[in-house]
């Protein structure tokens, strides 16, 4: 990516990071992941075009040096030894489009997507969680405004949270399923621009995944997305619901029977839960894994996941290789100050 612009830190402020340092960090990070890939051997390649954050084999992610600091990651796929990464290997992570940590605007979101498209990036990763649907809306609007060629553009989104109008949420859901920490006004909410008329309801069941998928298509205003990632199934209740509750099976059905998606994926931070999910489901269940913040210069907890994915032929989209911006002058690590 261009070293002519300063990398934007996680708090949505332009940091005075020296361009040369940003470039060096990117090269170091990519070299680390290339070394792992060449030692392990080639994995499976994601179906054409398209880290987010930032799938198939070991991926390396780095921050897009635009004013918005949307994150990106690269998939090494089954590249032969000596094959250099290109812009085609990058995925733009779209949580910053919703204004993570600080308020942003639709115009900034469009500028970010336009810069990515101009650079040749054609793959985008978003989620309902990012601004309670705001990232999806802004991404869809930006792709249309920028005239993106959707025949060459791939979009990934996530399932596990259903965004419901407040008047639709039941008393029982408010008691046990609403993720209150992600509602505007709560000190834990990191998306200040999120709408105030919806609530995030945790739902990792098959019907919940199906509704989340349909709602995402409506917000994006797209006929389809390429991949659905199970998002943050990192406690025992969510994990059990995704498996025993039929969530994983529903995604496989959407891919294999209905041809509604091309990839069944994971979008998680905890490497231990990623590996459990892989091991507790049959080979061929997952096409890719997005693992955030678990394989970078500060944290290598995800090493075992990389080897397990290599063994199974599962692509890895490695997100957060700059440790939530901490390695490039930011003030957050693992999404916390």
Describe the predicted segments one by one.
Residues 103-116, 205-219, 270-278:
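Short, acidic/polar
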Residues 1-17, 49-51:
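Short, low-complexity, Lys/Arg-enriched N-terminal segments of secretory-pathway carbohydrate enzymes
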Residues 118, 142-150, 218-222, 278-283, ...:
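Acidic (Asp/Glu)-rich catalytic clusters
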Residues 88, 96, 165-198, 306-337:
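Glycine-rich, positively charged active-site loop/lid region within alpha/beta enzyme cores that binds
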Residues 95-107, 194-210, 239-240:
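Active-site mouth loops of central-metabolism enzymes
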Residues 57-75, 108, 132, 214, ...:
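Beta/alpha (TIM)-barrel catalytic core signal, keyed to glycine-rich beta->alpha loops juxtaposed to Asp/Glu
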Residues 20-158, 163-167, 171-174:
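N-terminal binding-site loop/beta-alpha segment at the start of enzyme catalytic domains
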